Amino acid sequence: MLKTVLGLYGLLSCAAAQSNSVKVKWLEGIPDYLGGVTFGVPWPRGQHLANATTFTASGGVELQSWATAYWPDGSLKWTGHAIGATDSPADEYTITASGPGNTTFSRLRRQSSNSTRGVQVGNSEDKIVVNTGKVTATFRKSGNVLVSSIESGGKLVGNNGRLVLRSQSGTPDDDEDGKPTGINYFSFASKIHNTTVSDNNSQRALVTVQGIHAVDDETSHEEWLPFTVRFYLYANSEAIRIIHTIIYDGEAKSDFIAGLGIRFDVPLAGEEQYNRHVRIAGVDGGLLRESVQGITGLRRDPGAAVRSAQFNGTETPDKTTWDQRVTTRLQWVPTWSDYRLSQLSPDGFNIKKRTKAGQSWVKIPGSTRSGGLAYLGGSTVGGLALGLRDFWKKYPTGLDISNAATDTGSLTLWLYSPQAEPLDVRPYHDGLGQDTYAKQLDALEITYEDYEDGYNTPYGVGRTNELFLYAFSSTPSAGHLSTLTNNTNDPPVLIPEPTYIRDTKAIGSYWDVPGSPKDSEKAQTIESNMKFLIEFYEGQVEQRRWYGFWDHGDIIHTYDDDRHQWRYDIGGYSWDNSELSPDLFFWGHFLRTGDAKAYRLAHDQARHGGDVDSYHLGNFTGLGTRHGVQHWADSAKQARISTPVYRKTFFYISGGDERTGDLIRETQEAAKAFVLVDARRKVRAANVVYNPDPKALYLNFGTDWAGLAQAYLIEWERRGPNWEDARDKLVEAIKTYPKLKNGFVTGEAYYDSLTGAWSPPPTDPDNTGNITVSHLSGVFGVLETIDQLIDHFGPEARNTTQPFLDAFLDYAYYYGASKAEQAARYGKDFGNLNLKQGHSRFTAYVAHKRNNATLVPRVWSEYLGDGSKDGLAPNAPWKTVRISGSAALAPVDEATWVSTNAAALYGVAGIENLALVGAPDASSITGNSTAKLRV
């Protein structure tokens, strides 16, 4: 019956024609370049039916639209939209949804424009051809070449786009003398498994290529390192956006990545050597501007017009106009065939060039941080530019231009530079004799690391990079390439206004914009403190160089006051891996303010956490790893790290980023991983017998089930392949959890992963009332997930959801209640609990949901308390101290009173408390409904 209600509720209210307009604005002002953009828009429940709604954009802009999420009644919850390239982007766009209502709710068909200016796609048995109007790209469905040709202006300007991989079986530093023996070296090329293209393309086409790397020489090595490469092509655009993902599936002790990249050939036949151009991005928009055969600076001057043309990348005047002392001696002027930029640290890059293989390299003055883009081409034959977003932040990276003096040059972007040391993913210590659970738990008491042999594996972790490829029929101006470098590193982002997102309730009802619902001086202080924390972490990322192939996007857990250094080398105090939800703080701050700094922090965390901190192959698929010195080092593999609640905002606000969508759907696999990985194997009481069974998994509602529930919720929202099963499991979980005598205070219980049903735990088989309350259960997005879940079910399902919500509200109330209240309700108190400041939002949630003004003082007492060790006090310095001289390796700003745990919870609770109960001295709750507490 519930399914029927969920399907039909609200449809009658949609029977009349609907129209609604939403403004979307640029995150950081009007972009200098727009090669196409995809963005997301939320919609209130019941407002627009999926198969009866059309979308238009202001200014006559062509718009492609699709649904990314649905409310249970079939109305649109989130939509994705694409706009093609334009030379004059507007400062904002108004997206209008309109259409007659009806009483069916099939999927929204992707709307394609009838305009001939849109993307044209051809799909045959062996290839896919996409024409944007400026670029035509051909993608192969088999072999090792992903992109067989790229045309611009009717010219073939690029071909043979493929992936390259180098690896070796050992690392030279194992030998103190630096004379390694017994190391084997391997070279691999991409091997395509399948290539697909999106449907109904008008303003954007997406080509997805999946495959693996296979040896391309005489050596013997298993195929490995599976990849997914997505190519986004927009109408009227010269740019192709590329999302490149690999999954590490090697042996850490013998599979060392020595180079990982993407390579394109550039046809140069017929172009004079002096009309062939090399451009490599330097610092702050700067460029190395050279030609394969330079004619500036020679002893004899060819003429100002000739020199100017070469330097600016235009075709030089006819040679008959040159000084003949130059033209008759061009054979003595070297041609430089190879260029190489190596960014081996976040602070410096080197460049060099040579005439050909076998000749010495000549150094070119380098600098600090390259923009990560290179161009090879000619003034008449055209060429390609290829760039990597966050190039220097993801060091060691590189750019190679090869064979530029031949008929076919090549352009290689190294995601991991072969000039660097091999990528070493072996454990950072040998186990230190921790061969029993007792020893491992004892070691936890000193380094905070939860070690266990076999669990500290990188097998199954991934990495995603974002690249841009640009095609030209002639060499572009240096100014344009500089603009493209900026676009590569900071692509434009369109977002709806915060107040509109809030009003739709499409991503939670627990946040509000600053100053709402009521403002005050104390509220402004909290706002100022949260802004300080955002800027502090932005600064720490830079000062502490939290960059690198694996590391970019993460922050560190705890500070070492004595060393004036974050604890990068101490067990569980190192890389944070989303511990206690800094992601929710950064995304929450962005949602309510539109702040670009918060967006960048959150975006980078979403990319990093979803790929590096989580598993995509093997027994741990769907789970993530607890904080540690290496992102995969800790033996705690849990859904609390991989939970999609950390990536949900990015998925929807981006218009349904496909890689993030994969990660979210993958988290459903955690249900299978729970059978293979017992999260409490080391700490379970000896008298508890537990044998993991898909029908009886012993799970914690906060650290285990909440992540799985969020994955099921998004699958239901998206109407994915498994959505009905996901919905049914959520319904069953919501119906059965309140039947546990102590509700959420039970903490851990049996979960049937086949049906979603809960039953009493093995410690309380008769359901007399178990009490297991942990400070960790509530700090990995469980409140946010439950709120979104209840919102999604909606008022029509209240009979089903209310007992579940009441059980959760009881838990939320009693967590911060006095021990006497706890004992009076449950027979005994909960003991000494931590993270009271972070849990103040649970009290606020109860106060808000039950309209209980008497709880508001408790909210702010918990939040603005005495600054216990796990919180940030109002009287904290709220400023940094400069450390310089011999006290630190380099000058840094420190705040010894800040830990990432405390900062994350201060931010999340601050955002939610202000929204749920109003400012500390101006409460928005006027009721006094103590009776509603049911205590």
Language-model features and meaning:
Residues 1-17:
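Fungal secretory targeting signals
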